[in-house]
Amino acid sequence: MSIASWPESERPREKLLSQGAATLNDSELLAIFLRTGIKGVNAVELARRLLQEFGSLSALLAAPLPAFKAKPGLGEAKYAQLMACTELARRALSEQMRLGDALSSPQQVRDYLRLSIGRREVETFVVIFLSAQNRLIEVEEVFKGTLTETRVYPREVLRRALRHNAAALIIAHNHPSGVSEPSSADRVLTDTLKRALELVDIRLLDHFVVTGGHAESFAERGWL
């Protein structure tokens, strides 16, 4: 059955406009993005099938172009649209972080990091440089590694922190495996960086281990 024949209150676009985006499930939101279905399958049903085939919404968003465009109803144009939407959301979060206290909204920082590095296929180490008021100065991707590890040099992190005249840092790296549990090596690195930064009176506020669907906080675990 085509969506046009549904009661108006059940159509995804009309439902969003009248009740707000938060009231829609993943399939309905994805259907709005898809706009149309394929022969014999409306957009909502196509969205359901895609979510089932990819396994989750985060997996769909993290899919590389070859896997994405191999699915019926998807292609390079949809992939470009999706990447553009993701980048717009990341930039909007970056603007908000520059205007406010980064610690006042930990979820905002989490969302930014998930959008920035959560879907990367290799480990990427990011440093968020903050002022004395915890305002964003800059975000830099400092190191990149392999599928399972990245080498991080505390001296380079310290050098960049001093160059930015940062008073505090938040560090983060992704786990391409999709498992956000910190490793023992992650904890050792965090302790090493914290001690190095303390020598020049710079605070290490948090370390996030990031995947497409989650960002695990060292501070919330009491490890900082």
From Swiss-Prot:
It comes from the Bacteria. CDD domains: MPN_DUF2466 (cd08071). GO terms for biological process: proteolysis. GO terms for molecular function: metal ion binding; metallopeptidase activity. InterPro entries: MPN, RadC_JAB, RuvA_2-like, UPF0758, UPF0758_CS, UPF0758_N. It holds the Pfam family RadC. Gene3D superfamilies: 5' to 3' exonuclease, C-terminal subdomain, Cytidine Deaminase, domain 2. Keywords: Hydrolase, Metal-binding, Metalloprotease, Protease, Zinc. Residues 102-224 form the MPN domain. Belongs to the UPF0758 family. This is UPF0758 protein CV_3079. It comes from Chromobacterium violaceum (strain ATCC 12472 / DSM 30191 / JCM 1249 / CCUG 213 / NBRC 12614 / NCIMB 9131 / NCTC 9757 / MK). A motif (JAMM motif) lies at residues 173-186. Zn(2+) binds at H173, H175, D186.
